[in-house]
């Protein structure tokens, strides 16, 4: 039933038909198939083939999670953590993250690390946070390497921070490219190299990093790693700043500092 639903969803061997996909997912879910429950929950969360309904999404994520699906344990943890579709409940978030982590779910381990690092739902404990990050990173979670790099940088362990940023960037973590760009721009641990800094920011921007977009606009305004373009650079800086104000990245490490740096750069170059 799950396979039939997936074929109709993807249009594999049949004409794509969301109604048929949902029908087969529902039948599979009613028969206890965890993957059908997962896909049905995703459809309700995203409004794919059905009207968006977070109550139904939570219902099926919970059913799949209770059945042992680690991905859905993590999904529930994230939804309760961020208050998406449900009232924020950090006790439930931590519970689901921990259950997923017990099954070696790397993203759940990283999220637990973030909770301990920020004191969100648990007492702040950086040592415990770093242990969760380490375990997640060992399983290939690039964001965990970035998070480790950030805390090592704040502790002044710059060579170790660079190594984790590099590993995270190799795993396509967009914020890691921002961090590497800063190291190259300022000559931290590595030789100062404006062109390499700019390349890092360009790579991160393509991956969706607003922090990289802000840095890249600043590079173009100041001529870092390339020709200076004052008027066009100022326009890009203003555009990047407006985008940054609305971005979901606002809670990221260093985000507010980047916005303030861009504001100062604009003010210093407007005359």
How would you describe each model-predicted region?
Residues 246-271:
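Terminal, low-structured helical/coil segments at or just beyond the last alpha-helical repeat
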Residues 1, 10-12, 17, 30-33, ...:
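Short helix-capping/linker turns of helical repeat alpha-solenoids
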Residues 107, 126, 138-188, 194-202, ...:
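Eukaryotic tandem repeat interaction scaffolds
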Residues 1-10, 37-46, 73-82, 109-118, ...:
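Hydrophobic face of amphipathic alpha-helices that form TPR/SEL1-like repeat modules
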């Amino acid at each position: 039933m799950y396979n039939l639903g997936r074929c109709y969803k993807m249009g594999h061997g049949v004409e794509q038909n969301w109604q048929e996909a949902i029908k087969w997912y529902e039948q599979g879910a009613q028969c206890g198939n965890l993957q059908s429950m997962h896909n049905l929950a995703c459809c309700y969360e995203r409004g794919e083939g059905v009207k968006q309904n977070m109550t139904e999404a939570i219902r099926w994520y919970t059913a799949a999670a209770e059945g042992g699906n680690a991905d859905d344990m993590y999904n529930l943890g994230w939804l309760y953590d961020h208050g998406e579709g449900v009232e924020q409940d950090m006790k439930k978030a931590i519970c689901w993250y921990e259950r997923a982590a017990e099954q070696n779910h790397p993203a759940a381990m990283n999220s637990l690390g973030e909770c301990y690092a920020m004191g969100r739902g648990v007492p702040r404990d950086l040592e415990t946070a770093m242990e969760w990050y380490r375990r997640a990173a060992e399983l290939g979670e690039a964001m965990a390497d970035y998070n480790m790099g950030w805390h090592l940088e704040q502790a002044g362990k710059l060579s170790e921070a660079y190594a984790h940023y590099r590993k995270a960037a190799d795993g396509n973590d967009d914020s890691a490219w921002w961090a590497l760009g800063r190291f190259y721009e300022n000559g931290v641990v590595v030789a100062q190299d404006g062109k390499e800094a700019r390349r890092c920011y360009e790579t991160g921007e393509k991956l969706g990093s607003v922090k990289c977009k802000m840095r890249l606009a600043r590079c173009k305004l100041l001529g870092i790693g390339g020709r200076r373009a004052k008027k066009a650079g100022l326009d890009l800086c203003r555009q990047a700043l407006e985008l940054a104000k609305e971005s979901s990245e606002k809670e990221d490490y260093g985000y507010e500092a980047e916005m303030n740096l861009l504001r100062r750069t604009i003010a210093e170059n407007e005359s």
